[in-house]
Swiss-Prot record:
Name of this chain's protein: Protein lin-15B
Matching SMART domains: DM3, THAP
DNA-binding region ranges: 1317-1329, 1418-1430
Species name: Caenorhabditis elegans
Keyword Metal-binding: yes
Upper classification of the organism: Eukaryota, Metazoa, Ecdysozoa, Nematoda, Chromadorea
Pfam families: Lin-15B (PF25375)
Keywords carried by this UniProt record: Developmental protein, Differentiation, DNA-binding, Metal-binding, Repeat, Sexual differentiation, Zinc, Zinc-finger
Compositionally biased region (Polar residues): 757-767
Length: 1440
């Protein structure tokens, strides 16, 4: 019997594939075979098994699947373009990806992929088709590697069309490490055309550095050689890294980071501190490689500066940077960030050489505008000039400048070059085109060899004119492609577009070989994996799929949040290091809270200082006076004071006040006028006011030294005498001077003269002005003396027995304010009454202000102008109008030139009492309510003269100050040191407008000019001579900038040189600003016709044609008249006021005060007319409603802006007429600003009585009226109609309403003939007048109502005679007949009643005899109406 075992042995097992089978069998077939072999046997029933033959299993055929050729090719191209080896195709992660994309995809073997790559690289065609290129051919090269292996990367740039430049990338491995120009250029030329490479030549080549440029410049293959822009920037940054402040700071940062990473204990503590704050844990990586990594490392460390400082403070780590080093490094970081920004912009694929010059100018402007006064800034400027001198002043300068000119993104921009430079560059391009050789002529599409030089000049000149206009109007953005811009305008500028493509084709930077073959490069791995031949094939294929990446390209890892953190940290630390410059003169900063309040506030940037490398000066150094303002006895030699950029200035206080500490601040006290207090009662003194004891009685006080007087003979003689203000002539004018401690010090010339009653007064010089004097005793040692000054060293001492505050001088009221001559102002001169800024009020509202205030005060000298007979007694009382307290201002600038007259030295006591603090608080509240200041005269910062505010200018432009100082130095009025001090002052600079004319004259004389435009063409040596002096004041200014500054100043102030004679030549009236009256236009229309109004010259009317041809709109504009409101429109309020514009009575809160200055008041009166001037009051304040101004006339705080005038638009009346023949028919009339209008219905021409007439009836009626015999029977007592009209004068078109009175004499009115009443007559109401009974009989209720044409003629002043003729003063009316027998109404001439002004009409009317046109009852001519008998007989009006 056969057992199960033997049955199994006799079975034929399934065939297993041998190892020699192809590896291309799919994984599914292999898995299916293995499952068939390992399948378990079938379960059989127990018992004897019979022998039977089992059928053999069917063998599955193994299919050898091949990969898709297209899939293999695409996979090979992708792997090699990214520098990935082919073996990565069988990685599990990639297989899983492919199985997810396509489960049936077959991955090709590695050897198949390598063979495919070799085949593609050997059979591929060149990327650049040299025969089909358009325009120039450019190439950039770069070499990377070490001494053993070197790799070459180059890019070829060409044009296939006119709109875009193509870029082709090539990657090669060099066989020899020693470079040879012939082999290098041959390799590049074979890439373009491998068969005839000797014909390939390049227009431009960009080399990575000077060494390679010198290597290939000997060849004749290239026309122009350029060096990569990134090389110049790298050279500049390398010089920056060698600066001691920068290198030491970077070394400290690297040492600290290495220490943190090497010490595990420190690093764990740092991480725990960051975890508590939920902040970032990683420490910045140390830089390695180029300066890009250094900039990123520096940025991240500075962002972490506060964290590192806190950590070092907790663990007492000393080797970290301090705040001053941080300020130095933040300056370096911002400069490196600017360099990275421009390198990143110039490394894009479509970059051009035209972007180089704007990038350099941007970096230079950043250095000039961020001058912080550091010592190393001069070295930075020198390094910048040295690094970029080959571009800005080398042999390749013209190539870069012309490329910038032909780039529409930067052409003709003032930020790049001046207008004169752009014109000179245009001239160079024109000369090159006119004088081009035959080789360059082939570049153009047309044959220009047949054109002569004049024709070429005209062509290129016209194209430049069109380009200059188009580049301004259609300027592209900086990120757009300039080649596309030129391609779109090829037809408009045919020759100039070819020249522009020739210059713009060259890239600004070379290709970056380090990106491909450097450390961590894209192809670094395959370079060390494959052999030379296999690597060469891979690189040849990989270059076809690369985009151009220039040197300097980097990823911007500096986020906006990092920049904000840096700015906030820099702002705070800048104020901590230079706290004195931001403390606003407060010298008692003792607590950390005060420091934080100053540091935490927003701060302005540090001042720009001219002298950067000058050492500090001791504080006792005196300020040199102006040479011309010194007396003859003063020494002529004076060393210039050196500017200290970081030194905190000494604390300064007001010249007429004293500092009063209150709540941690110092308040200042200045004299205040008597002001009517219209505020709520002052609250009680707060509880937190400190109480301090009264000072003890001092034994003596110290008098301030007297400076040397100034003689008027030392004033500059070049100033015209009419412009010099002599302060000694009018003492009353000097009383109007406002003490302005905010801008300038208060100086005088005291002399020691005894004054009775224990005080010392000084007799002031002729140039001093009176002021209120405050003397307060101070407890000082006897040996103490005042600070040094320019005055004599002798100091008089006096004794005071009580510590009281006295007020020496006149106690008059408010100082009068001067208003210059005007019609309105003359009223004040006649009444000898001046306008006060605040009305005087004798009520006492100040509370405790009249108590004794023995507080800390400045030691001042008595006023010498007080009366000698009025001794200054110490009464211990403070007048309520003596002082006003304000927060202390910022005096962080250098001393002004004001102290040339002499500065008062101030002495203080050390104690306060409770009464003084309470009074200070009360006065401070009063000051806050009245912030407005008095109109004042100011002192010129140059000459020291006192002028009114209108004759001074607050100079805020730095260039204007520079040129004014330049003129003063050339005239010998200022020394160089004094000019440096003037440029360093930070307070407001008020300068006489006369100095601008003097400076302009000095510029004209210095540069030998005739006009302002001559500055652009003046010789360079004259500019260089002026630059020597300017460089001492502002070292960063170059010659081109100085030329532009001079030109702008001359253009802005050239009107000061124009004389009245020159202005008259220009047609302007210098003394009378009224424009000349235009000549009346003549009317040349034929006199045989009646001229319609459409062709007449309107009087104060504007004709506007409507859309329809038959209508005309007439806008009558009347003169502006001030509105007058009705009494019902007035408002009832608690605080009423009357508007002088509309006479409306309303709340004062909604009104403004009318300005009182001469200039503004004159403009208002000129605009609003004499009626507005008549409404102004002299003794009370004048108000005007806020509603009379537009919304734009007010500032954000609700104040009226200077120069704003109320709306004074004249009223307009719009009337629309329809033209029918020669007649105008009025349709509607509307007044501006109202809804009132009048209109008639032309379709229904109804008469006043309601009867409708057709056109034929009207003409027939007019025919009968004019053809009828005028000889009607009249009574003997009643004259005829013709007699009445012949005796009446011609009345003008405009009649004035005039009451009839007996004073005018008897009226010569004659009763008209008695006719049948005309039904169409209109009743007229006559005014009640005192007339004679005879005149009353002649008046009727009906007017004379002739025909249509006659009515129109009579309205215009014509008179109808007895024979039917209608005549005027200079014309007659002649009726003519039509072919049908009807008359034609036509006049021989017309009478024009247009007058130039309404006032002329009134005057002429008054001259004519007053004869009223008679009222004629009924119609003298024409047929009577059918219903005439139905009307009642009219009766004359009664006397009621």
């Amino acid at each position: 019997m056969q057992t199960l075992k033997t049955a199994r042995l006799t079975s034929n097992p399934a065939s297993i594939p041998t190892s020699s089978s192809s590896s291309a069998i799919s994984a599914a077939a292999i898995q299916k075979t293995l499952d068939a072999v390992n399948r378990p046997p079938a379960v059989r029933a127990s018992g004897i098994l019979r022998h039977r033959t089992l059928p053999a299993p069917t063998q599955e055929t193994a299919h050898h699947l091949d990969a898709d050729p297209k899939t293999t090719e695409l996979m090979a191209r992708f792997f090699i373009s990214q520098g990935i080896p082919f073996e990565c195709a069988h990685e599990p992660a990639f297989l899983e990806l492919m199985k997810h994309v396509d489960p049936n995809c077959v991955i090709p073997p590695t050897n198949v992929t390598k063979k495919l790559v070799d085949k593609i690289s050997t059979s591929s065609k060149p990327q650049v088709n040299y025969t089909k290129t358009v325009g120039p051919l450019s190439v950039t090269i770069d070499i990377c590697g070490d001494e053993d292996e070197k790799y070459l990367a180059f890019s070829i740039h060409y044009f296939e069309d006119l709109y875009e430049r193509k870029n082709a990338i090539y990657l090669r491995k060099l066989l020899l490490t020693e470079l040879d120009s012939n082999s290098l250029l041959t390799n590049i030329r074979r890439s373009v055309n491998s068969y005839s490479f000797s014909n390939v030549k390049f227009t431009n080549i960009v080399c990575p550095n000077e060494e390679i440029c010198k290597l290939v410049e000997e060849s004749a293959v290239v026309k122009r050689y350029n060096v990569c822009f990134y090389n110049y920037v790298t050279r500049f940054v390398a010089d920056l890294m060698e600066i001691e402040e920068f290198s030491s700071g970077l070394t400290q940062l690297r040492t600290f980071v290495r220490y943190m990473k090497q010490n595990s204990d420190m690093y764990s503590k740092f991480r725990r501190m960051q975890l508590q704050k939920n902040a970032e844990l990683d420490i910045p990586s140390i830089d390695s490689g180029d300066w890009h990594s250094t900039a990123i490392f520096l940025t991240r460390c500075l962002v972490w500066h506060d964290t590192f400082t806190e950590f070092c403070g907790k663990l007492d780590i000393l080797h970290y940077i301090d705040n001053e080093t941080f300020n130095h490094l933040i300056y370096l970081q911002r400069l490196l960030q600017q360099c990275m920004k421009h390198c990143r912009e110039l490394s894009i694929p479509n970059n051009s050489i035209s972007q180089v010059v704007p990038a350099i100018m941007s970096i230079r402007n950043f250095i000039a505008s961020n001058s912080m006064g550091y010592r190393f800034q001069k070295r930075i400027r020198d390094s910048f000039t040295t690094s970029f001198k080959e571009i800005t002043s080398g042999p390749s300068q013209d190539r870069y400048d012309i490329a910038t000119l032909l780039d529409p993104r930067f052409a003709y921009r003032d930020t790049v070059y001046t207008a004169q430079t752009w014109r000179s560059l245009e001239k160079k391009v024109i000369d090159d085109f006119v004088n081009s050789d035959l080789q360059n002529d082939k570049n153009f599409y047309q044959d220009i060899s047949i054109l002569n030089q004049e024709q070429r000049y005209d062509i290129i000149k016209k194209e430049f004119a069109y380009y200059r206009q188009t580049s301004f109007v259609e300027r592209p953005e900086e990120n757009e492609n300039s080649n596309h811009w030129w391609g779109m305008r090829q037809t408009d500028m045919e020759f100039l577009a070819v020249i522009a493509r020739e210059y713009l084709a060259s890239p600004a930077v070379s290709i970056d070989a380090g990106y491909y073959f450097g450390n961590g490069g894209k192809f670094q791995h395959i370079c060390h994996t494959y052999s030379h031949q296999r690597l060469e094939n891979c690189l040849a294929l990989a270059g076809n799929y690369q985009t151009f990446r220039g040197k300097g390209a980097s990823v911007d890892v500096i986020s906006q949040s990092m920049i904000e953190t840096l700015n906030n940290t820099a702002s705070r630390l800048q104020k901590q290091v230079h706290l004195g410059l931001y403390a606003h003169g407060v010298d008692n900063i003792s607590s950390d809270r005060d420091v934080q309040s100053i540091v935490g506030h927003h701060y302005p940037p540090m001042p720009t200082v001219a002298n950067y490398d000058i050492p500090h000066v001791p504080k006792e150094e005196e300020k040199p006076p102006v040479a011309n303002l010194q007396s003859t006895s003063s020494p002529a030699t004076s060393s210039p004071t050196i500017i200290r950029p970081r030194a905190a200035p000494p604390p300064r206080t007001l010249a007429q006040g004293r500092p009063i500490p209150l709540n941690g601040k110092e308040l200042k006290a200045v004299p205040i006028r008597q002001i009517p207090l219209q505020v709520r009662p002052l609250p009680p003194r707060p509880a937190n006011v400190p109480i301090v004891p009264r000072p003890t009685v001092p034994q003596q006080f110290i008098k301030a030294p007297a400076p040397k007087p100034i003689t008027l003979q030392a004033v500059v003689c070049s100033i015209p005498e009419k412009e010099i203000k002599k302060e000694t002539e009018d003492v009353a004018l000097l009383e109007k001077i406002k003490d302005e401690p905010l801008d300038e010090d208060d100086f005088n010339h005291p002399s020691t003269d005894p004054v009775p009653n224990r005080t010392t007064a000084s007799s002031q010089g002729p140039s001093s002005y009176p002021r209120k004097i405050v003397v307060l005793a101070s407890k000082l040692p006897t040996s103490q003396s005042s600070s040094p000054s320019t005055a004599t060293s002798a100091q008089a001492r006096s004794h005071v027995t009580t510590a009281q505050l006295i007020r020496c001088g006149p106690s008059e009221g408010t100082v009068p304010q001067k208003i210059h001559s005007h019609n309105f102002v003359q009223k004040f001169a006649q009444k000898q009454n001046f306008v006060h800024k605040y009305a005087l009020n004798s009520q006492d509202h100040t509370g405790r202000l009249n108590q004794t205030v023995p507080m800390r005060a400045a030691l001042r000298l008595p006023n010498s102008e007080q009366k000698s007979g009025a001794p200054s007694s110490i009464n211990g009382k403070v007048q309520r109008d003596d002082f006003k307290l304000e927060p202390l201002d910022d005096f962080n600038g250098e001393p002004d030139y004001d102290n040339l007259i002499g500065a008062q030295r101030l002495m203080y006591s050390d104690n306060l009492n409770d009464a003084s603090a309470e009074d200070a608080f009360a006065r401070h509240r009063v000051t806050m309510e009245f912030q407005k200041r008095r109109a004042c005269n100011r002192r010129c910062a140059v000459c020291g003269h006192l002028e009114i505010h209108e004759r001074l200018k607050n100079v805020t432009i730095e260039n204007e100050k520079l040129l004014i100082m330049l003129g003063c130095i050339y005239r010998g009025e200022f020394t160089l040191g004094q000019a440096q001090l003037f440029m360093a002052r930070e307070s407001k600079t008020y300068i006489c407008r006369l100095h601008f004319l003097e400076t302009l004259d000095e510029i004209y004389q210095m540069l030998r000019l005739k006009s302002a435009d001559d500055i652009l063409i003046c010789p360079l040596d004259l500019i260089q001579n002026a630059l020597i002096t300017v460089s001492a004041l502002r070292p960063h200014i170059i010659a081109s900038q100085l030329r532009k500054i001079l030109h702008d100043f001359a253009e802005r102030n050239n009107h000061l040189r124009e004389t009245p004679a020159e202005l008259k030549k220009l047609g302007q009236q210098y003394f009378d600003y009224r424009e000349p009256e235009p000549e009346p236009e003549r009317n040349d229309v034929d006199e045989q016709e009646i001229i319609p109004k459409l062709f007449r010259q309107p009087r104060k009317q504007v004709l506007e044609a409507d859309q329809h041809d038959g209508t005309v709109k007439v806008i009558e504009q009347e003169d502006f008249k001030l509105p007058t409101v009705k009494p019902s429109e007035n408002e009832e309020c608690d605080n009423p006021g009357v508007c002088c514009f509309c006479s409306k009575r309303g709340d004062r809160g909604g009104m403004l005060r009318v300005p009182r200055s001469e200039e503004r008041l004159a403009r208002w009166v000129d605009k609003l007319g004499p009626e507005f001037e008549a409404r102004l009051h002299t003794n009370t304040e004048n108000l005007i409603c806020r509603s009379h101004f537009p919304d734009a006339a007010f500032s954000s705080r609700g104040r009226l802006l200077k120069g704003m005038i109320p709306d004074a638009a004249p009223e307009k009346v719009e009337t629309t007429y329809i033209i029918q023949g020669n007649n105008f028919l009025k349709l509607k009339e509307r007044k501006s600003g109202t809804d009132k209008n009048s209109a008639i219905d032309l379709a229904n021409m109804l008469n006043p009585d309601g009867v409708e007439y057709t056109q034929e009836e009207e003409e027939e009626e007019e025919y009968e009226e004019m053809s009828r015999s005028p000889t009607e029977e009249t009574s003997d007592d009643e004259p005829s109609q013709a007699a009445v009209y012949n005796n009446a004068p011609v009345i003008k078109r405009t009649y004035r309403k005039r009451e009839l009175s007996n004073e005018d004499g008897p009226l010569n009115l004659v009763t008209p003939p008695a006719h049948t009443p005309n039904p169409r007559g209109r009743p007229r109401k006559y005014p009640k007048n005192s007339v004679t009974p005879e005149a009353e009989k002649s008046l009727t209720d009906y007017d004379y109502n002739p025909g249509t044409s006659q009515r129109r003629a009579l309205k215009k002043g014509y008179v109808q005679l007895e024979d039917g003729e209608i005549v005027g003063e200079d014309c007659e009316y002649v009726p003519e007949k039509t072919p049908s027998g009807r008359l034609i109404r036509q006049a021989v001439a017309r009478r024009s009643f247009a007058f130039a002004d309404e006032e002329e009409e009134e005057e002429e009317y008054e001259e004519s005899p007053i004869v009223k046109k008679p009222k004629i009852a009924g119609r003298p001519v024409g047929r009577p109406r059918k219903d005439a008998n139905k009307l009642p007989t009219p009766t004359p009006p009664s006397n009621e």
